From Swiss-Prot:
Protein name (database record): Protein IQ-DOMAIN 23
Keyword Nucleus: yes
Keywords: Calmodulin-binding, Cell membrane, Cytoplasm, Cytoskeleton, Membrane, Nucleus, Repeat
Summary of subunit composition and partner proteins: Binds to multiple calmodulin (CaM) in the presence of Ca(2+) and CaM-like proteins.
Gene name linked to the record: IQD23
Gene Ontology biological-process annotations: response to calcium ion
InterPro entries, per the entry: DUF4005, IQ_motif_EF-hand-BS, P-loop_NTPase
PROSITE patterns: IQ
Renumbered ranges of motif Nuclear localization signal: 10-17
Organism expressing this protein natively: Arabidopsis thaliana (Mouse-ear cress)
Primary localisation category: nucleus
Annotated compartments: Nucleus; Nucleus, Nucleolus; Cytoplasm, Cytoskeleton; Cell membrane
Amino acid sequence: MGFFGRLFGSKKKSDKAASSRDKRRWSFTTRSSNSSKRAPAVTSASVVEQNGLDADKHAIAVAAATAAVAEAALTAAHAAAEVVRLTSGNGGRNVGGGGNSSVFQIGRSNRRWAQENIAAMKIQSAFRGYLARRALRALKALVKLQALVRGHIVRKQTADMLRRMQTLVRLQSQARARASRSSHSSASFHSSTALLFPSSSSSPRSLHTRCVSNAEVSSLDHRGGSKRLDWQAEESENGDKILEVDTWKPHYHPKPLRSERNNESPRKRQQSLLGPRSTENSPQVGSSGSRRRTPFTPTSRSEYSWGCNNYYYSGYHPNYMANTESYKAKVRSQSAPKQRVEVSNETSGYKRSVQGQYYYYTAVEEESLDVGSAGYYGGGGGDSDRLNRNQSAKSRMHSSFLV
């Protein structure tokens, strides 16, 4: 009895000691579990309170909460492992319901740990979702800001381009208006010059042909000058007119005969024919009575030169460089003066110079005339007066005025 009593008593004591140890251990576990339960509650409360704080602070708080949960889970795992070790070491001695109670406690602690882990994961997922939503909102705001900036830049570029196009169109219109004004002014200028100078409106070809025609007329006039002078000499001789001859002839030299001219050298003959003369050294022949006046045809070098000069000097200069009326009247008076053909019985063969101007003499072609020919004298010969008159008419010269 005593042995069995001690045995059972020791067993009871050992059971009591084991139960006291288990209680202590379970109290530790309960404390750790309570602390783990309280920590998530505190963390959840802190998360709810700090929703308005910055994201960095929230992240730090969540990291601290997860660290606390991990520490609690680690302590719970250590406690469970120690309980399992103790129960496995005393398994041969414990035959009653003590082992079942310890297993039940371990299952409860594992369930709690799993629930705590699930709660922590939910908290983390919720916080991560919050951060993702916030980042998405920030990204959307950034995209909107970029769109606004780009739209402002595009609108500014479009306005600048439109302003440049308007400036270009305005410049083009101004250039067109200036060109139209210049063309209108040039047309008005040409019309005014055509009114002032009719020859300027004709083409250069017509002007050239006109100059050539004037030259031909002047050459024809030179050819027929001798015959006209013969007729005028005969008519003046037949009329009852008294001619007065100026006796002042200091520089007069009679024309040599044809034989003498043939003996002269060509150079000397050219110098004698082309010598300049003026009113001072030219003979003056006049009449006291009324003289027979023949119309003067100004188809000479002066008209030819005036027509050609009019081609070059009219219509190609501005209005302020055009010839005035007084200048044109002066040129007209100098180029085509009123001439009176004066014939004397003497064989002078010269015309009077007008207004003291110098001019050159050109002899009539003597080869086309034959002094002794019967056709020239009208058949037969003639008396000495008629011979002298024909010879003087033959040797007359016509002048070309220098304008």
